[in-house]
């Protein structure tokens, strides 16, 4: 077992999956069967979020990429002209940071890339530049895709640092600026002090899901050390200011007294003016944060927290003075080092005051009325839950969460809130914050939603107000309306993810789109900046449509903005563009046709981590740049991947490189397992023992194909069990089609395992018709080929067919082969045999005779009646049944039977006597006794028979 937990040597003695994989990958490459160009067929365009190349492709990539790969192959079988291709994301700072870490021989990085990413040490130590890393991992990613048998059009591949791709991005940014979507200003951004750059999600080692939270700093005042001072309190709920009874200070921590000046940015450039804002006392960490957020901080002195105890501070709204009290729970890493205390509504504050014995002294001030609570909600819920003291964290969290949720959704401000009385809590924050800011009793401070936010370089990130920064104004309400419209008209898999996209659009704020360092496209209208990696990856799907033309040898100089303007928007004069670009008119027109043919994008596939960034940005940029007819049509989201219960980690492991999985298990086993082991939104846990089982079952299909070809073809009349197997197989065609169309690939796996069980049952029931088995294998080879293409190509060839199964059409259902009665009949036999075994197990006898009794006719009549009224529940059904004379005379037995049938399931009536007679020999062989169907009613057992559940007597 290696560092990633993979067992080596998992081949199978009868089938060499690696050899089969090699064979068909070579044939596909030589035949170029996956290269796509516009023609007269219906098109299908699917993409996945391209991988970032700061490591090898891992198990998470495998799942995310194999889903669209499978769908692409399925859509080809539906005679669609499928465009499915890939690019590589390399821009930004992570690759630059990795190069520096390798150059510095950072031990943990060297270990991880040598042992987890499987980079030989001599090769690894050469990766000292971003260019070397890009070259290394682009080759490895390409090889991984090919080893997995992905059906990609490689002519369209590109990297985001390609100069030709940069020309496309330049055009995009010119357009966005022209539309007013890009502005320059001063905004708070997530920032790395070491890299001297704003950082995005992909730049982070920890805290990828952190957001920037806006706190209100309420300016309480006091006198200390002979000076008038401001003691700002950070809060997310400014309405609670009306209920403050005291404030908390951590007596064991260091605070600072400092002169504060606001930095006011001048209209032009990045220069600022300073405006005096008083003397503040805040926590030492807070002072460092404020320096980065438009304030100049001049430290006057340090103060121990216990020196401030007993100080009276004035509430700027109520004008009341409240005391500072000690609390060890005050965290200096969040806010200002002070915490307002609102004990009537905050369980933590109430319990802390109770522990100090200060409740009577400071009192409780109610400010929110909530239906279902008394005057003091915090006191009520603390007593109800039995919270003992401040250390009872679990109950305190429960209490806080409950009250805050109820206050937000059901609470209204009371008379203690003056002019704001009667306003609901959920509507008050924005108004109050605005009023407080205008009255100069509050300011804004920004914090992370998570405390641990670390850049990939290892530096702790801060929130910094960057001046002269370029932003994309995603906060624009009109732009958001278009994004919502797009989302409303898109398909989503799973469907319930739609609302999350709406939420992300609502929450979207202006976003820094450029930085000073890293790989990427120079901002065309300000060469001091480089476009960052979450902004150059929003519409590249459109680039795929014309990439094959560009990759044939067009130069960056030829890719003028007017070319993209014409190809994507139809604007401009082709002759003029030809003249200025030196690209032939024919090529330009072909590029335009290719774009118009393949756009819009039918499906975009990704893991759920890209919802708040890449995917939402894709929607925004498409609705800004393209007409409605070219807006994206669908997004598929899958869960994450773990390895034997362990979370993937590029630095600590496991990683499970894609190429390693392919070599150890074979591409088909990996593809089958990763797409079918979990439902789409669920996280998939890779278990190697289960992968081995999947491999063994796939090989059974191959071995069956070989065996049916080795036996001579003979014409036989179809038996009932033959017809049953054909029914099951042809029924699978529609089931698999629905699964593929709806991205429910786990169902394909479940259907395949059902096939394996069906084949076992068929053999057990005496099935031996080679023609039937060949037909079953042919159909299932087609159904499985999108998931396991190499093995299916091999089986297809073994069955004697020429050409590629990858180019075959989806199988058509033969309605004459579908008969639900056959399936119900076999399930009836299985159920009866299970009942026989259960009776045998209890009675512990070896019967010589077995009597099987089917139900009386009136019971089947009742079943038919229930089928005709299947929408009715038991309560509604019984009065209807009892109106019928043929049922009424059976009295209480009817009601009992209705419940029993409901328990079994209301199914259509079948010819149970005929089915049992047909299966009699089989049942006799299974239990080694004589079977009598509806013979002498021994000991009155027949009356216990109900539809689908024969009565049984043994002797």
Swiss-Prot record:
Chain residues that bind ATP: 650
First-level EC class: ligase
GO cellular component terms, A-Z: cytoplasm
Single annotated GO MF: leucine-tRNA ligase activity
Keyword Cell inner membrane listed: no
Organism: Methanococcus maripaludis (strain C5 / ATCC BAA-1333)
Name of the protein in its database record: Leucine--tRNA ligase
Primary subcellular site in the record, as a coarse category: cytoplasm
EC id: 6.1.1.4
Any one GO biological process: leucyl-tRNA aminoacylation
Catalysis performed (reactions): tRNA(Leu) + L-leucine + ATP = L-leucyl-tRNA(Leu) + AMP + diphosphate
SUPFAM superfamilies assigned: Anticodon-binding domain of a subclass of class I aminoacyl-tRNA synthetases, Nucleotidylyl transferase, ValRS/IleRS/LeuRS editing domain
InterPro entries: aa-tRNA-synth_I_CS, aa-tRNA-synth_Ia, Leu-tRNA-lgase_arc, Leu-tRNA-synth_Ia_arc/euk, M/V/L/I-tRNA-synth_anticd-bd, Rossmann-like_a/b/a_fold, tRNAsynth_Ia_anticodon-bd, Val/Leu/Ile-tRNA-synth_edit
Localization of this protein: Cytoplasm
Alphabetized PANTHER family for the sequence: LEUCINE--TRNA LIGASE, CYTOPLASMIC, LEUCYL-TRNA SYNTHETASE
Motif stretch ('KMSKS' region): 647-651
Source species, domain of life: Archaea
Family affiliation: Belongs to the class-I aminoacyl-tRNA synthetase family.
């Amino acid at each position: 077992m290696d560092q990633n937990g993979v067992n080596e040597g998992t081949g199978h003695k009868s089938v060499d999956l690696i050899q089969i994989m090699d064979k068909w990958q070579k044939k596909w490459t030589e035949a170029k069967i996956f290269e796509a160009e516009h023609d007269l067929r219906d098109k299908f365009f699917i993409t996945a979020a391209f991988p970032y190349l700061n490591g090898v492709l891992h198990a998470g990539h495998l799942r995310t990429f194999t889903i669209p790969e499978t769908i692409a192959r399925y859509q080809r079988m539906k005679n669609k002209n499928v465009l499915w291709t890939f690019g590589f994301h390399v821009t930004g700072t992570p690759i630059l940071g990795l190069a520096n870490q390798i150059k510095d021989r950072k031990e943990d990085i060297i270990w991880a890339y040598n042992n987890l990413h499987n980079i030989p040490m001599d090769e690894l130590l050469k990766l000292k530049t971003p260019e070397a890393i890009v070259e290394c991992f682009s080759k490895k990613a390409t090889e991984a895709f090919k080893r997995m048998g992905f059906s990609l059009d490689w002519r369209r591949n590109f990297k985001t640092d390609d100069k030709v791709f940069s020309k496309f991005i330049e055009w995009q940014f010119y357009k966005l600026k022209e539309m007013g979507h890009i502005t320059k200003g001063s905004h708070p951004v997530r920032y790395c002090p070491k890299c001297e750059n704003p950082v995005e999600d992909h730049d982070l080692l920890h805290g990828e899901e952190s957001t920037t939270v806006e706190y209100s700093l309420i300016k309480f005042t006091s006198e200390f050390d002979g000076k008038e001072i401001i003691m700002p309190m950070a809060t997310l709920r400014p309405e609670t200011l009306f209920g403050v009874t005291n404030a908390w200070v951590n007596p064991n921590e260091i605070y600072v007294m400092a002169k504060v000046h606001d930095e006011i940015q001048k209209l032009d450039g990045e220069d600022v003016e300073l405006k005096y804002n008083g003397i503040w006392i805040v926590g030492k960490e807070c002072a460092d944060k404020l320096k980065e957020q438009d304030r100049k901080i001049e430290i006057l002195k340090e103060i121990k927290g216990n020196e401030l105890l007993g100080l009276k501070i004035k509430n700027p709204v109520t004008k009341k003075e409240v005391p500072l009290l000690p609390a060890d729970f005050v965290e200096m890493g969040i806010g200002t080092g002070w915490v307002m205390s609102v004990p009537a509504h905050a369980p933590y504050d109430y319990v802390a005051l109770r522990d100090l014995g200060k409740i009577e002294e400071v009192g409780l001030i109610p400010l929110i009325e909530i239906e279902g609570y008394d005057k003091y909600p915090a006191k009520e819920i603390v007593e109800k839950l039995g919270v003992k003291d401040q250390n009872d964290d679990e109950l305190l969290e429960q209490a806080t969460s409950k009250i805050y949720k109820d206050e937000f959704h059901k609470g209204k401000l009371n008379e203690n809130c003056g002019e704001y009385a009667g306003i609901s809590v959920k509507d008050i924050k924005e108004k109050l914050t605005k009023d407080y800011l205008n009255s100069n009793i509050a300011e804004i401070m920004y914090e992370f939603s998570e405390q641990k936010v670390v850049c990939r370089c290892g530096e702790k990130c801060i929130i910094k107000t960057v001046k002269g920064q370029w932003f994309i104004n995603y906060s624009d309400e009109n732009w958001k309306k278009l994004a919502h419209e797009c989302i409303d008209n898109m398909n989503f898999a799973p469907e319930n993810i739609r609302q999350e996209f709406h939420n992300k659009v609502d929450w979207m704020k202006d976003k820094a789109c450029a930085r000073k360092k890293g790989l990427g496209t120079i901002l065309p209208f300000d060469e001091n900046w480089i476009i960052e990696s979450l902004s150059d990856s929003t519409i590249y799907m459109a680039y795929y449509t014309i990439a094959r033309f560009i990759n044939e040898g067009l130069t960056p100089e030829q890719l003028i903005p007017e070319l993209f303007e014409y190809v994507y928007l139809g604007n401009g004069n082709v002759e003029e563009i030809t003249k200025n670009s030196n690209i032939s008119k024919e090529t330009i027109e072909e590029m335009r046709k290719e774009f118009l043919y393949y756009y819009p994008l039918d499906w975009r596939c990704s893991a759920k981590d890209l919802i708040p960034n890449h995917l939402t940005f894709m929607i925004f940029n498409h609705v800004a740049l393209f007409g409605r007819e070219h807006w994206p049509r669908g997004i598929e989201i899958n869960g994450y991947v773990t390895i034997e219960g362990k979370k993937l980690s590029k630095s600590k492991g496991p990683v499970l490189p894609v190429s390693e999985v392919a070599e150890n298990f074979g591409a088909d086993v990996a593809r089958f397992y990763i797409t079918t082991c979990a439902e789409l939104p669920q996280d998939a846990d890779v278990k190697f023992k289960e992968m081995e089982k999947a491999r063994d079952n796939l090989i059974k299909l191959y071995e069956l194909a070989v065996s049916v070809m080795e036996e001579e073809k003979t014409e036989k009349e179809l038996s009932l069990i033959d017809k049953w197997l054909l029914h099951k197989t042809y029924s699978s065609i529609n089931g698999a089609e629905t699964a593929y169309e709806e991205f429910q690939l786990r169902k394909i796996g479940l259907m395949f395992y059902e096939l394996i069980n069906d084949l076992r049952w068929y053999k057990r029931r005496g099935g031996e018709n080679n023609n039937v088995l060949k037909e079953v294998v042919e159909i299932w080879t087609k159904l499985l080929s999108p998931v396991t293409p190499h093995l299916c190509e091999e089986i297809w060839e073994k069955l004697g067919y020429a050409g590629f199964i990858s180019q075959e059409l989806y199988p058509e259902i033969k309605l004459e082969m579908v008969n639900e009665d056959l399936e119900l009949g076999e399930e009836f036999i299985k159920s009866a045999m299970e009942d026989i075994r259960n009776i045998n197990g209890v009675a512990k006898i070896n019967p010589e005779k077995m009597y099987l009794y089917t139900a009386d006719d009136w019971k089947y009549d009742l079943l038919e009646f229930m089928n005709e009224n299947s929408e009715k529940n038991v309560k509604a059904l019984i009065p209807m049944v009892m109106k019928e004379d043929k049922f009424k005379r059976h009295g209480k037995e009817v009601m009992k039977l209705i419940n029993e049938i409901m328990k079994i399931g209301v199914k259509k009536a079948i010819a149970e006597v005929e089915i049992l007679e047909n299966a009699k020999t089989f049942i006799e062989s299974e239990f080694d006794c004589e079977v009598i169907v509806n013979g002498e009613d021994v000991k009155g057992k027949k009356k216990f028979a109900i539809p689908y559940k024969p009565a049984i007597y043994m002797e």
